[in-house]
Protein backbone atom coordinates (compact mmCIF):
# COMPACT_ATOMS: atom_id res chain seq x y z
CA UNK A 1 0.00 0.00 0.00
CA UNK A 2 1.34 3.40 -0.92
CA UNK A 3 -0.88 5.42 1.43
CA UNK A 4 -1.20 5.75 5.19
CA UNK A 5 -4.09 4.09 7.02
CA UNK A 6 -5.51 4.24 10.54
CA UNK A 7 -2.77 1.77 11.53
CA UNK A 8 -0.37 4.70 11.20
CA UNK A 9 -2.50 6.96 13.41
CA UNK A 10 -1.39 6.68 17.02
CA UNK A 11 -1.51 9.12 19.93
CA UNK A 12 -4.50 11.04 18.58
CA UNK A 13 -6.38 11.59 21.86
CA UNK A 14 -7.75 15.12 21.85
CA UNK A 15 -6.88 15.67 18.19
CA UNK A 16 -9.54 17.03 15.82
CA UNK A 17 -9.89 14.47 13.04
CA UNK A 18 -11.85 15.56 9.96
CA UNK A 19 -13.35 12.42 8.43
CA UNK A 20 -14.84 12.59 4.92
CA UNK A 21 -17.63 10.03 4.81
CA UNK A 22 -20.38 9.14 2.35
CA UNK A 23 -23.80 9.81 3.87
CA UNK A 24 -25.57 10.31 0.54
CA UNK A 25 -28.24 7.80 1.52
CA UNK A 26 -31.82 7.41 0.25
CA UNK A 27 -34.42 9.17 2.42
CA UNK A 28 -38.20 8.83 2.24
CA UNK A 29 -40.59 10.81 4.44
CA UNK A 30 -37.68 11.90 6.61
CA UNK A 31 -36.47 8.34 7.21
CA UNK A 32 -33.26 6.77 5.88
CA UNK A 33 -34.40 3.75 3.83
CA UNK A 34 -30.99 2.15 3.22
CA UNK A 35 -28.23 2.51 5.81
CA UNK A 36 -25.55 0.54 3.91
CA UNK A 37 -23.26 3.53 3.39
CA UNK A 38 -23.49 4.54 7.05
CA UNK A 39 -22.68 0.97 8.10
CA UNK A 40 -19.61 1.01 5.83
CA UNK A 41 -18.07 4.06 7.54
CA UNK A 42 -19.03 3.10 11.10
CA UNK A 43 -15.81 1.08 11.79
CA UNK A 44 -13.61 4.09 10.98
CA UNK A 45 -15.68 6.43 13.16
CA UNK A 46 -15.72 3.95 16.06
CA UNK A 47 -11.97 3.31 15.85
CA UNK A 48 -11.11 7.02 15.91
CA UNK A 49 -13.58 7.60 18.76
CA UNK A 50 -12.08 4.73 20.77
CA UNK A 51 -8.60 6.23 20.24
CA UNK A 52 -9.86 9.41 21.91
CA UNK A 53 -10.04 11.65 18.85
CA UNK A 54 -12.60 14.41 18.45
CA UNK A 55 -14.32 12.97 15.37
CA UNK A 56 -15.68 15.58 12.96
CA UNK A 57 -17.67 14.19 10.02
CA UNK A 58 -17.73 15.89 6.62
CA UNK A 59 -20.22 14.79 3.97
CA UNK A 60 -22.44 15.94 1.13
CA UNK A 61 -26.09 15.13 0.56
CA UNK A 62 -27.83 15.57 -2.77
CA UNK A 63 -27.03 18.38 -5.20
CA UNK A 64 -27.89 21.72 -3.59
CA UNK A 65 -25.66 23.63 -6.06
CA UNK A 66 -23.77 25.70 -3.53
CA UNK A 67 -26.77 27.05 -1.62
CA UNK A 68 -28.45 25.87 1.60
CA UNK A 69 -31.52 23.74 0.80
CA UNK A 70 -33.60 22.67 3.79
CA UNK A 71 -34.49 19.26 2.30
CA UNK A 72 -30.79 18.49 1.83
CA UNK A 73 -29.65 19.21 5.37
CA UNK A 74 -27.60 16.45 6.97
CA UNK A 75 -29.46 17.09 10.23
CA UNK A 76 -32.04 14.54 9.05
CA UNK A 77 -29.30 11.90 8.74
CA UNK A 78 -27.75 12.44 12.20
CA UNK A 79 -30.22 10.18 14.03
CA UNK A 80 -29.55 7.28 11.62
CA UNK A 81 -25.80 7.70 12.19
CA UNK A 82 -26.42 7.73 15.97
CA UNK A 83 -28.44 4.53 15.75
CA UNK A 84 -25.75 2.64 13.85
CA UNK A 85 -22.86 3.93 15.97
CA UNK A 86 -24.89 3.47 19.15
CA UNK A 87 -23.53 6.77 20.46
CA UNK A 88 -24.55 10.42 20.51
CA UNK A 89 -23.81 12.35 17.32
CA UNK A 90 -23.79 16.14 17.67
CA UNK A 91 -24.69 18.40 14.75
CA UNK A 92 -23.37 21.79 13.60
CA UNK A 93 -25.46 23.96 11.27
CA UNK A 94 -22.47 24.81 9.04
CA UNK A 95 -19.27 23.07 7.96
CA UNK A 96 -17.07 26.19 8.27
CA UNK A 97 -17.00 29.41 10.31
CA UNK A 98 -18.11 30.04 13.88
CA UNK A 99 -20.94 27.49 13.96
CA UNK A 100 -18.54 24.68 13.10
CA UNK A 101 -15.64 25.98 15.23
CA UNK A 102 -17.80 26.48 18.33
CA UNK A 103 -19.36 23.02 18.07
CA UNK A 104 -15.92 21.41 17.67
CA UNK A 105 -14.55 23.38 20.65
CA UNK A 106 -17.28 21.88 22.84
CA UNK A 107 -16.43 18.27 21.91
CA UNK A 108 -14.92 15.97 24.49
CA UNK A 109 -12.37 13.33 23.47
CA UNK A 110 -14.08 10.43 21.69
CA UNK A 111 -17.21 12.38 20.80
CA UNK A 112 -18.63 12.62 17.28
CA UNK A 113 -19.87 15.73 15.47
CA UNK A 114 -21.56 15.86 12.07
CA UNK A 115 -21.07 19.11 10.16
CA UNK A 116 -23.67 20.47 7.73
CA UNK A 117 -23.66 19.54 4.02
CA UNK A 118 -20.38 20.65 2.41
CA UNK A 119 -22.21 21.29 -0.87
CA UNK A 120 -24.13 24.17 0.74
CA UNK A 121 -21.01 26.15 -0.26
CA UNK A 122 -19.99 26.74 -3.89
CA UNK A 123 -16.35 26.28 -2.87
CA UNK A 124 -16.86 22.54 -2.25
CA UNK A 125 -17.35 21.41 -5.85
CA UNK A 126 -14.98 24.10 -7.18
CA UNK A 127 -12.26 22.90 -4.77
CA UNK A 128 -11.80 26.59 -3.94
CA UNK A 129 -8.63 27.29 -1.95
CA UNK A 130 -10.31 29.70 0.52
CA UNK A 131 -13.03 27.14 1.25
CA UNK A 132 -10.44 24.38 1.69
CA UNK A 133 -8.52 26.61 4.13
CA UNK A 134 -11.74 27.26 6.09
CA UNK A 135 -12.43 23.51 6.31
CA UNK A 136 -8.83 22.72 7.30
CA UNK A 137 -8.98 25.26 10.15
CA UNK A 138 -11.30 22.85 11.97
CA UNK A 139 -8.96 19.86 11.99
CA UNK A 140 -5.52 18.55 12.88
CA UNK A 141 -5.73 15.36 10.79
CA UNK A 142 -7.69 14.38 7.66
CA UNK A 143 -9.11 10.91 7.04
CA UNK A 144 -10.85 10.09 3.75
CA UNK A 145 -13.28 7.19 4.06
CA UNK A 146 -15.44 8.11 1.05
CA UNK A 147 -14.11 6.09 -1.87
CA UNK A 148 -17.50 6.63 -3.52
CA UNK A 149 -16.65 10.35 -3.88
CA UNK A 150 -12.98 9.77 -4.78
CA UNK A 151 -13.57 10.43 -8.48
CA UNK A 152 -14.40 14.05 -7.62
CA UNK A 153 -11.64 16.63 -7.04
CA UNK A 154 -13.71 18.54 -4.47
CA UNK A 155 -12.56 20.48 -1.42
CA UNK A 156 -13.52 17.80 1.12
CA UNK A 157 -12.39 14.84 -1.02
CA UNK A 158 -9.12 16.15 -2.50
CA UNK A 159 -8.27 19.69 -1.37
CA UNK A 160 -8.03 18.92 2.35
CA UNK A 161 -5.31 16.31 1.81
CA UNK A 162 -2.96 19.12 0.71
CA UNK A 163 -3.47 20.98 4.02
CA UNK A 164 -3.49 18.29 6.70
CA UNK A 165 -1.75 14.94 7.35
CA UNK A 166 -3.88 12.59 5.22
CA UNK A 167 -4.93 8.98 5.87
CA UNK A 168 -7.25 6.41 4.30
CA UNK A 169 -10.14 5.23 6.46
CA UNK A 170 -11.05 1.55 6.77
CA UNK A 171 -13.65 1.59 3.96
CA UNK A 172 -11.27 3.41 1.62
CA UNK A 173 -8.50 0.95 2.55
CA UNK A 174 -10.70 -2.13 2.00
CA UNK A 175 -11.95 -0.79 -1.32
CA UNK A 176 -8.46 -0.01 -2.62
CA UNK A 177 -7.08 -3.38 -1.51
CA UNK A 178 -9.99 -5.17 -3.23
CA UNK A 179 -9.58 -3.17 -6.42
CA UNK A 180 -5.86 -3.89 -6.50
CA UNK A 181 -6.72 -7.61 -6.37
CA UNK A 182 -9.39 -7.12 -9.04
CA UNK A 183 -7.49 -5.30 -11.79
CA UNK A 184 -4.33 -3.74 -10.36
CA UNK A 185 -2.31 -6.91 -9.86
CA UNK A 186 -4.78 -9.77 -10.27
CA UNK A 187 -4.37 -13.52 -10.29
CA UNK A 188 -5.01 -14.79 -13.82
CA UNK A 189 -7.08 -15.71 -15.70
CA UNK A 190 -9.20 -12.59 -15.12
CA UNK A 191 -12.81 -12.68 -16.32
CA UNK A 192 -15.01 -9.57 -16.42
CA UNK A 193 -18.80 -9.63 -16.62
CA UNK A 194 -20.32 -6.42 -17.93
CA UNK A 195 -24.08 -6.13 -18.28
CA UNK A 196 -26.76 -3.51 -18.13
CA UNK A 197 -28.91 -1.80 -20.69
CA UNK A 198 -26.67 0.40 -22.79
CA UNK A 199 -23.27 0.26 -24.45
CA UNK A 200 -23.25 4.07 -24.63
CA UNK A 201 -22.77 4.40 -20.86
CA UNK A 202 -19.92 1.87 -20.77
CA UNK A 203 -17.80 2.50 -23.87
CA UNK A 204 -14.74 3.63 -21.85
CA UNK A 205 -15.18 0.69 -19.51
CA UNK A 206 -15.28 -1.89 -22.31
CA UNK A 207 -12.33 -0.32 -24.13
CA UNK A 208 -10.24 -0.46 -20.95
CA UNK A 209 -11.26 -3.98 -19.92
CA UNK A 210 -10.39 -5.69 -23.21
CA UNK A 211 -6.77 -4.62 -22.61
CA UNK A 212 -6.71 -5.96 -19.04
CA UNK A 213 -8.78 -9.13 -18.83
CA UNK A 214 -8.56 -12.58 -20.39
CA UNK A 215 -12.28 -12.88 -21.13
CA UNK A 216 -15.10 -10.35 -21.25
CA UNK A 217 -18.67 -11.61 -20.81
CA UNK A 218 -21.18 -9.16 -22.26
CA UNK A 219 -24.80 -9.50 -21.13
CA UNK A 220 -27.93 -7.45 -20.59
CA UNK A 221 -29.33 -5.12 -23.23
CA UNK A 222 -25.82 -4.13 -24.30
CA UNK A 223 -25.21 -7.64 -25.68
CA UNK A 224 -27.90 -6.95 -28.30
CA UNK A 225 -25.89 -4.03 -29.67
CA UNK A 226 -22.88 -6.31 -30.19
CA UNK A 227 -25.01 -9.06 -31.71
CA UNK A 228 -26.69 -6.61 -34.10
CA UNK A 229 -23.26 -5.29 -35.12
CA UNK A 230 -22.43 -8.86 -36.15
CA UNK A 231 -25.56 -9.08 -38.29
CA UNK A 232 -27.91 -10.80 -35.84
CA UNK A 233 -31.57 -9.70 -36.02
CA UNK A 234 -32.49 -8.90 -32.41
CA UNK A 235 -36.20 -8.28 -33.07
CA UNK A 236 -37.71 -5.70 -30.73
CA UNK A 237 -34.94 -6.04 -28.15
CA UNK A 238 -33.32 -2.99 -26.59
CA UNK A 239 -30.46 -2.18 -28.96
CA UNK A 240 -28.32 0.84 -29.86
CA UNK A 241 -28.03 0.27 -33.60
CA UNK A 242 -26.17 3.57 -34.04
CA UNK A 243 -23.27 2.15 -32.02
CA UNK A 244 -22.57 -0.74 -34.41
CA UNK A 245 -19.18 0.69 -35.43
CA UNK A 246 -18.22 1.29 -31.78
CA UNK A 247 -19.13 -2.32 -30.97
CA UNK A 248 -17.06 -3.58 -33.92
CA UNK A 249 -14.09 -1.48 -32.78
CA UNK A 250 -14.30 -2.96 -29.27
CA UNK A 251 -14.47 -6.48 -30.72
CA UNK A 252 -11.41 -5.74 -32.89
CA UNK A 253 -9.49 -4.33 -29.90
CA UNK A 254 -10.34 -7.46 -27.89
CA UNK A 255 -9.10 -9.69 -30.70
CA UNK A 256 -5.85 -7.75 -30.89
CA UNK A 257 -5.35 -7.93 -27.12
CA UNK A 258 -6.11 -11.67 -26.95
CA UNK A 259 -9.25 -11.10 -24.87
CA UNK A 260 -12.06 -13.59 -25.50
CA UNK A 261 -15.48 -11.98 -25.97
CA UNK A 262 -18.35 -14.08 -24.62
CA UNK A 263 -21.73 -13.15 -26.12
CA UNK A 264 -25.05 -14.99 -25.66
CA UNK A 265 -25.68 -18.00 -27.90
CA UNK A 266 -29.32 -18.27 -26.84
CA UNK A 267 -31.83 -15.98 -25.18
CA UNK A 268 -35.05 -15.91 -23.21
CA UNK A 269 -37.54 -13.92 -25.27
CA UNK A 270 -40.98 -12.48 -24.54
CA UNK A 271 -43.50 -10.23 -26.29
CA UNK A 272 -44.05 -8.06 -23.22
CA UNK A 273 -41.93 -6.94 -20.30
CA UNK A 274 -43.81 -7.97 -17.18
CA UNK A 275 -43.58 -10.53 -14.39
CA UNK A 276 -44.52 -14.02 -15.52
CA UNK A 277 -44.84 -12.99 -19.18
CA UNK A 278 -45.07 -15.86 -21.67
CA UNK A 279 -41.51 -16.60 -22.69
CA UNK A 280 -39.41 -19.10 -24.60
CA UNK A 281 -35.76 -19.94 -25.12
CA UNK A 282 -34.51 -19.45 -28.68
CA UNK A 283 -31.19 -19.65 -30.49
CA UNK A 284 -29.67 -16.17 -30.65
CA UNK A 285 -29.89 -16.28 -34.45
CA UNK A 286 -33.61 -17.13 -34.35
CA UNK A 287 -35.10 -14.26 -32.34
CA UNK A 288 -38.70 -13.68 -33.49
CA UNK A 289 -39.24 -10.28 -35.11
CA UNK A 290 -41.98 -9.36 -32.60
CA UNK A 291 -40.08 -10.48 -29.47
CA UNK A 292 -37.39 -9.04 -27.23
CA UNK A 293 -34.51 -10.77 -25.45
CA UNK A 294 -34.87 -10.23 -21.68
CA UNK A 295 -32.26 -12.69 -20.40
CA UNK A 296 -29.55 -14.97 -21.72
CA UNK A 297 -30.52 -18.62 -22.16
CA UNK A 298 -29.35 -21.88 -20.52
CA UNK A 299 -26.56 -22.62 -23.04
CA UNK A 300 -25.19 -19.12 -22.49
CA UNK A 301 -25.36 -19.58 -18.70
CA UNK A 302 -23.38 -22.80 -19.09
CA UNK A 303 -20.71 -21.01 -21.14
CA UNK A 304 -20.51 -18.11 -18.65
CA UNK A 305 -20.19 -20.48 -15.70
CA UNK A 306 -17.41 -22.36 -17.51
CA UNK A 307 -15.47 -19.08 -17.76
CA UNK A 308 -16.13 -18.37 -14.07
CA UNK A 309 -14.80 -21.88 -13.29
CA UNK A 310 -11.59 -21.13 -15.19
CA UNK A 311 -11.09 -17.72 -13.62
CA UNK A 312 -8.84 -16.87 -10.68
CA UNK A 313 -10.27 -13.33 -10.59
CA UNK A 314 -13.76 -12.07 -11.48
CA UNK A 315 -14.75 -8.42 -11.90
CA UNK A 316 -18.49 -7.83 -12.31
CA UNK A 317 -20.45 -4.72 -13.30
CA UNK A 318 -24.06 -4.97 -14.46
CA UNK A 319 -26.68 -7.76 -14.60
CA UNK A 320 -26.98 -10.33 -17.40
CA UNK A 321 -30.72 -9.82 -17.88
CA UNK A 322 -33.78 -7.96 -16.60
CA UNK A 323 -33.22 -9.47 -13.15
CA UNK A 324 -35.84 -7.30 -11.42
CA UNK A 325 -38.60 -9.38 -12.99
CA UNK A 326 -38.90 -13.18 -12.80
CA UNK A 327 -38.18 -15.33 -14.73
CA UNK A 328 -35.66 -13.01 -16.41
CA UNK A 329 -33.36 -13.17 -13.37
CA UNK A 330 -32.22 -16.76 -13.96
CA UNK A 331 -28.89 -16.05 -15.69
CA UNK A 332 -27.80 -13.36 -13.23
CA UNK A 333 -28.73 -15.53 -10.24
CA UNK A 334 -27.07 -18.66 -11.69
CA UNK A 335 -23.79 -16.89 -12.49
CA UNK A 336 -23.79 -15.06 -9.14
CA UNK A 337 -24.35 -18.28 -7.18
CA UNK A 338 -21.59 -20.07 -9.11
CA UNK A 339 -19.14 -17.21 -8.51
CA UNK A 340 -20.12 -17.11 -4.83
CA UNK A 341 -19.56 -20.86 -4.42
CA UNK A 342 -16.08 -20.65 -5.98
CA UNK A 343 -15.26 -17.64 -3.79
CA UNK A 344 -16.38 -19.48 -0.64
CA UNK A 345 -14.18 -22.42 -1.68
CA UNK A 346 -11.18 -20.08 -1.86
CA UNK A 347 -10.78 -20.60 -5.62
CA UNK A 348 -11.83 -17.15 -6.83
CA UNK A 349 -11.28 -13.48 -6.00
CA UNK A 350 -14.61 -11.81 -6.86
CA UNK A 351 -15.03 -8.04 -6.96
CA UNK A 352 -18.35 -6.46 -7.95
CA UNK A 353 -19.75 -2.95 -8.00
CA UNK A 354 -22.30 -0.52 -9.38
CA UNK A 355 -25.85 0.06 -8.16
CA UNK A 356 -27.65 -2.52 -10.30
CA UNK A 357 -24.92 -5.06 -9.62
CA UNK A 358 -25.26 -4.72 -5.85
CA UNK A 359 -29.04 -5.05 -6.16
CA UNK A 360 -28.64 -8.12 -8.40
CA UNK A 361 -26.25 -9.85 -5.99
CA UNK A 362 -28.56 -9.06 -3.08
CA UNK A 363 -31.44 -10.52 -5.13
CA UNK A 364 -29.37 -13.69 -5.62
CA UNK A 365 -28.62 -13.63 -1.86
CA UNK A 366 -24.87 -13.92 -2.42
CA UNK A 367 -23.53 -10.38 -1.91
CA UNK A 368 -21.89 -11.40 1.39
CA UNK A 369 -20.08 -14.29 -0.31
CA UNK A 370 -18.17 -12.16 -2.81
CA UNK A 371 -14.64 -11.09 -1.92
CA UNK A 372 -15.71 -7.45 -2.13
CA UNK A 373 -18.86 -5.64 -3.22
CA UNK A 374 -18.37 -1.94 -3.83
CA UNK A 375 -21.19 0.49 -3.08
CA UNK A 376 -19.24 3.29 -4.74
CA UNK A 377 -21.12 3.61 -8.04
CA UNK A 378 -19.40 6.25 -10.17
CA UNK A 379 -15.99 5.90 -8.52
CA UNK A 380 -16.03 2.12 -9.02
CA UNK A 381 -16.93 2.56 -12.68
CA UNK A 382 -14.21 5.18 -13.26
CA UNK A 383 -11.67 2.89 -11.60
CA UNK A 384 -12.77 0.07 -13.95
CA UNK A 385 -12.39 2.51 -16.84
CA UNK A 386 -8.77 3.11 -15.84
CA UNK A 387 -9.39 6.78 -15.04
CA UNK A 388 -7.54 8.65 -12.28
CA UNK A 389 -9.36 9.07 -8.96
CA UNK A 390 -8.29 12.44 -7.47
CA UNK A 391 -9.33 11.53 -3.92
CA UNK A 392 -7.13 8.42 -4.05
CA UNK A 393 -4.22 9.89 -5.99
CA UNK A 394 -3.76 12.71 -3.47
CA UNK A 395 -3.46 10.18 -0.61
CA UNK A 396 -0.68 8.44 -2.53
CA UNK A 397 1.11 11.69 -3.40
CA UNK A 398 1.04 12.95 0.17
CA UNK A 399 2.67 9.85 1.59
Curated annotation (Swiss-Prot):
Q: What is this protein called?
A: Phosphoglycerate kinase
Source superkingdom: Bacteria
Q: Which reaction does it catalyse?
A: (2R)-3-phosphoglycerate + ATP = (2R)-3-phospho-glyceroyl phosphate + ADP
Q: Does the keyword Metal-binding apply?
A: no
Name the residues that bind ATP.
202, 324, 354-357
Q: Name one GO biological process term.
A: gluconeogenesis
Entry keyword Nucleus:
no
Q: Which InterPro entries match?
A: Phosphoglycerate_kinase (IPR001576), Phosphoglycerate_kinase_CS (IPR015911), Phosphoglycerate_kinase_N (IPR015824), Phosphoglycerate_kinase_sf (IPR036043)
- Where does the record say this protein resides? Cytoplasm
Q: Please give the family membership noted in the entry.
A: Belongs to the phosphoglycerate kinase family.
In terms of PANTHER family, this protein maps to: PHOSPHOGLYCERATE KINASE, PHOSPHOGLYCERATE KINASE 1, CHLOROPLASTIC-RELATED
Protein EC: 2.7.2.3
Metabolic or biological pathway: Carbohydrate degradation; glycolysis; pyruvate from D-glyceraldehyde 3-phosphate: step 2/5
Q: How does it assemble?
A: Monomer.
Give binding positions for substrate: 22-24, 37, 60-63, 119, 152
User: GO MF annotations for this entry?
Assistant: ADP binding; ATP binding; phosphoglycerate kinase activity
